[in-house]
Amino acid sequence: MTAKFTDYIVKDIGLAEFGRKEISLAETEMPGLMATREEYGPKQPLKGAKIAGSLHMTIQTAVLIETLVALGAEVRWVSCNIYSTQDHAAAAIAAAGIPVFAVKGETLKDYWDYTAKLFDWSDGGTPNMILDDGGDATMFVHQGLRAENGDTMFLDQHNSEEEEIFFALIKRILKEKPKGYFATLAKNIKGVSEETTTGVHRLYDMEKAGKLLFPAINVNDSVTKSKFDNLYGCRESLVDGIRRGTDVMLSGKVAMVAGFGDVGKGSAASLRQAGCRVMVSEVDPICALQAAMEGYQVVTMEDAAPIADIFVTATGNKDIITIEHMRAMKDRAIVCNIGHFDNEIQVATLKNMKWDNIKPQVDEITFPDGKRMILLSEGRLVNLGNAMGHPSFVMSASFTNQTLAQIELFQNQGKYEKKVYVLPKTLDEKVARLHLAKIGVKLTELRKDQADYIGVKVEGPFKADHYRY
């Protein structure tokens, strides 16, 4: 008799059937991942791969996980945000016998405890690959090894509640695990593929400092990720989160978007399409000029604070909306973030204010003068905390890139140095090509003489690496 599978933590395993139905629907909308299963499944290119995955545990991610398994990998999974898990998706993955540790609304302590579970394989082994979103799984290994090697002073110098919890976990592991635990982890990991802008920044910082422990592929800057997921995904999911959270009429409201990168562009478009009058702030003169040429009013946060009804941060930076900005806002202004971390808004400064929880991930905060502010998802990702994240189709492109990156790193161990790489343009174009038929796109084909005339191959790639799209 087979032992009952118990290597998981989910909210309710009884949600598995519901999750499985939604996974089936998502598969129809994820042609890239399904084509990848069909092409690579017989070859089993990930056989022997033990992937530690830290990425929002959604229905779409479930399709990614099962694609990795179909290609031969063993997988353990956690969510990379305390509010982004879809509990029915986690239940379906657990019911399929895949270890997953993710609950929507989990505490920060739970979040980091679950992250630690990623690295404790049930057979006593360790992972040999990381699939990351935001870099927390990667940082777990790097900061753990740093402390294990004797540099422990930073463990007592936390700058946030989350850092305090994370550093306490490292201290505990150093006491409980055999000596050399983190060194073994670092040695066994052959590479990481990183999903998002914030995590990529962390990787490049470590590479620049000479501290990157294993090769990395920057999936975020694949064109079929950043120009689609970041842009078109946010264009659909931002207003979904705001509407589900507040039921507010968006048409006619004044909205302020901080940042006009790909995520900011999608966010501004989302609000404009909903009928908002949109303002934008930027530090980059090129992005500021782009925003102005698109017809947005480009202002500072100081200008916008007393005027806007809705505020969205999309910068990947810290302290974008400060306590001073919040004090200057209208009564019941709506404040949210669509960047990866919660420090874009100075939520920690609100700790001693009066908090009234209206419903999950919607809080009304009252200032000493009686003014109120509506904060969504405690300043964490609004589209995943208050809604269901990006649609399946656009996530198919991102996750096909992730799958190809995992195959590339695992199949070519020793080829890559401890640096950050991007996938070649041939694969970027392949990912795009896999999604065309689903939406009825017919490509024009170059003749040989036309290809020769512009100096490309008939089958591509069609653009130079420096082309910006």
Swiss-Prot record:
It is found in: Cytoplasm. It comes from Rhodopseudomonas palustris (strain ATCC BAA-98 / CGA009). This is Adenosylhomocysteinase. One of its GO terms (molecular function) is adenosylhomocysteinase activity. NAD(+) binds at residues 196-198, 230, 259-264, 282, 317, 338-340, 383. Signal peptide: none annotated. InterPro entries: Adenosylhomocyst_ase-like_sf, Adenosylhomocysteinase-like, Ado_hCys_hydrolase_NAD-bd, NAD(P)-bd_dom_sf, S-Ado-L-homoCys_hydrolase_CS. The gene is ahcY. Keywords: Cytoplasm, Hydrolase, NAD, One-carbon metabolism. It is an enzyme of class 3 (hydrolase). GO terms for biological process: L-homocysteine biosynthetic process; one-carbon metabolic process; S-adenosylmethionine cycle. Belongs to the adenosylhomocysteinase family.
